[in-house]
Regions:
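Active-site acidic/histidine proton-transfer and metal-coordination neighborhood
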Residues: 12, 16-17, 84-88, 97-190, ...
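Histidine-acidic metal/acid-base catalytic patches
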Residues: 2-30, 38-39, 43-54, 173-192, ...
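Hydrophobic faces of well-ordered beta-strands that scaffold small-molecule active sites
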Residues: 29-33, 61-63, 89-94, 126-128, ...
Length: 285
């Protein structure tokens, strides 16, 4: 078994030569793997989805930590296989059904292990989701926890990105604005789930204009009559968001996320979503 200190040291050494500014003067297009069924214990199924994402013309991918944590003990071979596909590993995402009761994000022991292991696999971001605290005291603890997680991720050679769901942007964005104020911009970035934000009533183009300097990436998803549909088939203001991105000169990652609560639509959702995304940004399909 690899000890955590050894894992972190190895990850930091491997990541030291990786520049986050590589290609920083252009947008990057990615896709979350969660649109497809994956057998987390069978890494071949993960690689097959990454290869499919690359074949669709995306620059890179994001995936849940459960899909890759089994590779941490023999990361060199897994990294070789990922690199062989030619897709960048935008980020490894920790989504849980239950979070730390005090911090409202993943426990430190988990995110430290995932940050170190993810870095060995070539991940560029550690992505954390969380639950909404009930008051400012809880939000303060959450912000402090994100700062600590961001510092640790930085030691491993990754950037930390906090991913929102709907509650963070409800009530005029009370929580997300608090986290933006109280987290250290040198340690904490945000992965704006623009679809969740839109569904919760946020003015997404305006948010992008205000906070683009804190954004590592955006998840784009669409809704029609309260149900998620492939991007471009609902009411999400895709063109307006693309215009806001152009106007700000932001150069991060825009990612299709076509997960569903009760199914894995795969190609039937990703292909039209990819086409809509690429058209909106003038990228050939």
């Amino acid at each position: 078994m690899i000890h955590r200190r050894e894992l972190l040291k190895s990850a930091a050494l491997l990541a030291a030569g990786r520049a986050f500014g590589a290609g920083a003067d252009q947008l990057h297009f990615g896709c979350q793997t969660n649109a497809w069924p994956i057998a987390a214990r069978d890494f071949a199924t993960v690689l097959a989805v990454i290869r499919k994402i690359k074949d669709y013309g995306y620059d890179g991918f994001e995936t849940g930590f459960a899909n890759v944590e089994g590779q941490f003990e023999h990361a060199a071979e897994a990294r070789r296989q990922i690199d062989g596909i030619g897709a960048r590993f935008f980020g490894v995402h920790i989504f849980l059904l239950q979070y730390d009761a005090e911090t409202h994000v993943a426990p430190a022991a988990l995110y430290e292990r995932v940050a170190a292991g993810g870095a060995l696999l070539g991940a560029e971001h550690l992505i954390l989701s969380g639950t909404p605290p009930a008051d400012d005291a809880g939000r303060k603890r959450k912000a402090e926890a994100l700062n600590r997680a961001g510092a640790y991720a930085g030691q491993a050679g990754l950037r930390l990105a906090y991913h929102n769901h709907g509650p963070e942007v409800e009530h005029n964005g009370t929580e997300i604005e608090f986290l933006l104020r109280e987290t250290d911009p040198s340690k904490v970035w945000f992965l704006l789930d623009a679809g969740h934000a839109f569904h919760a009533g946020a003015d997404v183009p305006a948010f992008v204009r205000r906070h683009h300097t804190r954004l590592a990436g955006m998840h784009l998803r669409d809704y029609k009559n309260g149900e998620q549909v492939p991007l471009g088939m609902g009411d999400f203001p895709l063109r307006a968001v693309a215009d806001a991105i152009r106007q700000t000169g932001w150069h991060g990652w825009v990612l299709n996320e076509e997960e569903r609560l009760t199914s894995k639509p795969g190609d039937s959702a990703v292909k039209p979503a990819r086409d809509a995304l690429f058209r909106a940004f003038g990228k050939g399909v």
